[in-house]
Design a protein with these regions (language model features):
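A glycine-rich phosphate-binding loop feature that marks nucleotide/adenosyl-phosphate handling sites
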Residues: 5, 21-24, 60, 106-116, ...
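Active-site flanking loop/helix segments enriched in acidic
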Residues: 15-41, 67-76
Length: 258
């Protein structure tokens, strides 16, 4: 990009961090193109959404860096952990370009998580649940709706990235990827509350059962149970769990007083 200041043209580097991707070789077992060509094709595969497009521009910036690039036993390039380094770079770039904190957080998260789907094609729902629960408690998204939206965007990033590799020639594999994407979004939307406000009951219902001072701890207990996958986020199930929890506490308390 050029800018004119005091009668002089000045070159302004927009994304110097991406220059090393041009012509950067990738493992031909998985990739048809060099890293920059792969990036451009992934962008071309994606919906016209700013967060998705930025995530794809930045998702492989860590590839080829001296501390990341390795050779596997076949002598082909490998970039383990590039997504974490790419996320660090993405956060710095988007902050430099003046994007707001929530947008920077979202895109950085998309970049950091974009490699998580591939192993899930083999391991299935158990690993999905563990991953989603971890993100519900640690990702920084404030509500179940926010987390669901983030995962919906991540699925688009994953599919666009996947479609810029040899996988694009394997319709069954692409179909499995799309199915996995639908499964994870549905899991987040229906089974993974992020905060107590996402629960099917709140303080008003609990006031009929416990003192106001206990409500916060009871809601936290229910949130953990639902996130762990052993309690459905349904009003009757939650109320039953509260009754059982209070009964156990009363039994323990009476035993301590004997």
């Amino acid at each position: 990009c050029h800018a004119r200041e005091n009668g002089n043209d000045t070159v302004i580097p927009i994304l110097p961090e991406a220059l090393h991707l041009l012509g950067l070789h990738q493992n031909p077992r998985f990739h048809l193109y060099d890293t920059w060509e792969h990036t451009l094709l992934a962008i071309d595969n994606s919906p016209h959404d700013l967060a998705i497009r930025w995530a794809l521009v930045l998702h492989d910036l860590g590839k080829g860096l001296p501390e990341i690039r390795k050779l596997n036993k076949e002598g082909q390039p490998s970039d383990p952990g590039h997504e974490a380094e790419s996320a660090i770079m993405a956060q710095a770039i988007l902050t430099r370009l003046g994007y707001n904190n929530s947008f920077v957080h979202l895109v950085t998260w998309l970049v950091a998580q974009h490699m998580r789907f591939a192993p899930m094609l083999l391991t299935g729902e158990r690993t999905l649940l563990r991953w989603v629960r971890s993100e519900a408690t640690n990702s920084g998204f404030r509500t179940q709706a926010e987390l669901t939206q983030a995962y919906s965007l991540l699925v688009e990033v994953f599919l666009a990235d996947m479609g810029a590799t040899h996988a694009r020639e394997n319709e069954q594999l692409m179909a499995e990827g799309r199915l996995l994407g639908r499964q994870v979004v549905e899991l987040v939307r229906t089974r993974m509350p992020v905060c107590s406000k996402d629960l099917a009951i709140g303080g008003r219902e609990l006031l009929e059962l416990v003192h106001q001072s206990e409500i916060k701890s009871i809601l936290f207990y229910l949130l953990e149970r639902v996130q762990s996958g052993n309690l459905p986020n349904e009003k009757e199930a939650l109320l039953t769990a509260v009754h059982k929890h209070l009964k156990r506490k009363a039994t323990i308390s009476s035993g301590d007083n004997v």
